[in-house]
Amino acid sequence: MSIVNLVPLTIGVFEGLHQIHAHILQTRFKSDTYILNTLLVMYTKCAHLVDARQLFNNMSRRDTFTWNMMLTGYAKNGHADEAFRIYEQMQQQGKRDVVSWTALIVGLVENGCGEEALEIFSQMQEDVRVMNALVSMYARCGSLDEAQQVFDNMDIKDVVSWNAMIVGYADHGQYAESFDDAQQLFDKMETKNVISWNTMIGGYAELGNSDQCGSMKDAQQVFDSMANRNVISWTAMIGGFSKDGDGEEAFSVFNQMQQEGIVPNTITFISILKLCASTAALLAGKRVHAIINQAGLQADISVGNALVDMYAKCGSIVDAQKVFDKMYERDVVSWNAIITGYAQHGLGEDALQLYNQMQQEGLSPDSTTFVGVLSACSHAGLVYEGLQLFNSMCHDYSIIPTVEHYGCMVDLLGRAGLLNAAEGFIRNMPFEADASIWAAFLGACRIHSNVKLADHAAKILLRTETQNAAVYVQLSNIYAAAGLWDDVEKVRNSMKDRGVKKEPGRTWIELGDQTHSFMIEDRSHPQSEKIYAELDRLGKLIQTAGYVPDTRFVVHDVDEKLKEIALCYHSEKLAIAFGIINMPSGTPIRIIKNLRVCTDCHTFTKFISKITGREIVARDSRRFHHFKNGLCSCGDFW
């Protein structure tokens, strides 16, 4: 047990404190300010002020905490004169702060020295630095009324005073009136510094496109009005545009920032890497990685973790592993990022190997780790291993399962066809299943064509998810595959009556420094004629190779030929054709889709990978699919 741990155990035990003190003086900790401060706390709490003062006098280095602790000890134990003397010494050395003032005032009041307390309080009000600290303390704690009261009563205010209030209101700007107050204060400021401007940018960026107040348009106006911007200003804009879903503008700001000679910091890089990850912009991510290396930040653990996450989410688990292997230091976040990456790519056994390696290296898994490994088991169909891990999480690590863990287990059992077991798992949960769990169960019903259970799950989902188009689409697909066209029509009418619109499928593909987007039957692209011609050519080749369109989930009761035509020009097919036209032979094609890839597009892509000899990596809303030589890494199980 360390000395720091031993000291608190001796509270109230005078001999124990003396023994610890004597031991400290014989070790390398005899000049350690933190250790000695801890001992000083114990002496003052036990009211051993003679020993506390002796320790205080013998300390070679004293910080503000040391002085405040000695002052507080005297004040709380009725030694107002000694407390005042310490206070005067602090004043001479510039050590006093809001804690010093408060401790002295409380001590004087408790000892019946009301006049002296009022005099000190008057002096305190004249010290703008201390009053600023008091405003800031209230604001950080969310006590905005108290902060405003202190602020209003200040005779002298500087830019720090105003900033403290603006930061307080902006930090609580999820409430419209709070951010309005921040804006009003900002407008009243005669002198603004970079902190003032950055606070407003950060507040607007956090709000995004809120209808209540604030937006990235407002943030841009504030940003454009700044005479001097620093790295925090630029980073706030990047983060705001990223959160707002405007990746193009975020990348533009990042590029402009560098052109103006502003060196990105760790937070900037993490923010832009998250954007690359969310948009699967692998080439952009690699360029950012190169800039990180030039800046000498590749050894930063937070940046390393963001790089692992970015590469995994961009479809390059190989690059993610390379970054992970080169990290000088790894924490549980590092391991979680690589484990989750392998899980998303359907490489369950690799994820489990990493999980075991993590433990061998002395790191304990946390709640997020288990979400990753349970998801890995689900994607890989490792039912037995998943059940073992769930039990281990509860019994070996005392981690209470969350809705995410239960969702993984329902997904695991459901994908494996154990639908009754999955439903039983839901019913035995210690809390009511939310929409995500019933959605996982509905997805399993689709995979295994269980109309009865799907109908049951959908009814439960639609009690709360009346505007969730995905539920209607899933149910409609299940009915269509079973040939229940009357039920398909009922679902369609229900969507129409409730004003629910299906999110249109969209697929993105990165080429050079540009990202190209496609929708179903999209003819807006400049290369549209070439893309459609290439798609027709590929269609003939794969039909010769044995491809048969999968029309089961076409939700229209029409002729089979019309169903096949409806499948021809899905967004992912257009993106793949574009990639084949524009990328050198043998180059992997990477696409990202906002929805789950349909069964026909999945089959189509397997055949394309075979006849072209290309690897095609597709990220949909569920997972990654690696198509190679006519096979998919998901094993047709998604």
Where do the PLM segments sit?
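Terminal (and in a subset, N-terminal) low-complexity or junction segments at the ends
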Residues: 1-638
